[in-house]
Amino acid sequence: MNKIKYTTALLLGGLLSFSSCTDNFADFNSTDGAYTEELQKYDNQTNLVPFATIQKGIIYQTGVDGTDWQYQVIQNLVADMFCGYFHDMNGSFNANNSTYNLNNGWTSAMWIYTYGYVMPSIADAEALNTEKEWPLYHAITKILKVATLHRVSDYYGPILYDGFGTADQKPQSQEEVYKRFFEDLETAVNILKDYKGGVSFESADFMMPEGKRTPAQWLKFANSLRLRLAMRVSNVAPELAEKQAKAALDAANGGVLETANETVGEYGIRNPLGGVAGWSEVYMNASLESFLKGYNDPRLKSYFNPAQDGRDKDGNINKEVAGVKQLSSIEDEYKGVRQGTGVADNRYSTHSQTTLSLIHISEPTRQA
């Protein structure tokens, strides 16, 4: 009998002890400094959290050292080569995009990273920031969505725009998607031009220049993007293009970006072209040389270094390259590599290299 009493007492003691331990169970199992849901509610952080990922995803760059290759396969080895902006000098790439033999892994990267990394955050921002409750964040979400996905549509044509992540999602034609771009931009413009203040986006904004992280500046960006897209469809839908261009340029809608100090970029994020240039895999394309030199574009000296005649990429005197003498003197000239040139990579050592290593990422409105 005594044994039973003692056993019962021990069990009750254990239960009481366990109960006292679990009184603070949530505290014991939390991490000091964790960004909890409760903390995210302060200063509207719950609503703002998705925007960092979205802004970094337009010109894809996570900002972490060692991730430049993602930008390279999304943008530099695809659109930049195909459009004649740059040419790589990696000899192993000569059988791929720079000679018009498209690499499926590179050409699919834009879709994979946008829909795997950026679109979930856009969907979160759409769900969190309704027009009624959070009009400013709602408008900026729409602008960023268009800024992100117009680039994807220009790669692939039909894309997933509406209904992402739902059971009935389906691709929409490029014609339909462009109409949706204009609808969303019009909604954003109407919200922003009538916005009377309240919440701020400044703490989450790293696309507008410091001192201009305001709804008025986002309004200008929306109009500039609207004008850009109108120009894109001018040859296939001239009436739509005219309507949208006039709306974008209507002073009553807030104006467009016009001055150098209004440059839209990704401020504070390392330019991935600097990393790619460090691998000696991005040189000026001859097509870009033709435009920049032909129009005496003042940006030429900021974008590229002049060629070095008779020197290899390490600066050593090298009058013969791969056993072949230099055909002409191009020292101190700005020379690009002709698209489709499939020669040994050390033949490119004299051409103009990019100088973008210390410049913030180019503004989304100027990217192909």
What are these regions (language model features)?
Residues 1-30:
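Bacterial Sec-dependent N-terminal signal peptides
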Residues 8, 18, 150, 367-368:
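Intrinsically disordered, low-complexity Ser/Thr/Pro-rich tracts
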Residues 1, 365-368:
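Generic low-complexity segments that are intrinsically disordered, proline-rich and/or Lys/Arg-biased
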Residues 88-358, 362, 366:
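Structured, solvent-exposed acidic/aromatic patches
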Residues 7, 47, 115-118:
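Generic alpha-helical segment signature
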Residues 21-83:
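Membrane-proximal, proline-rich intrinsically disordered regions
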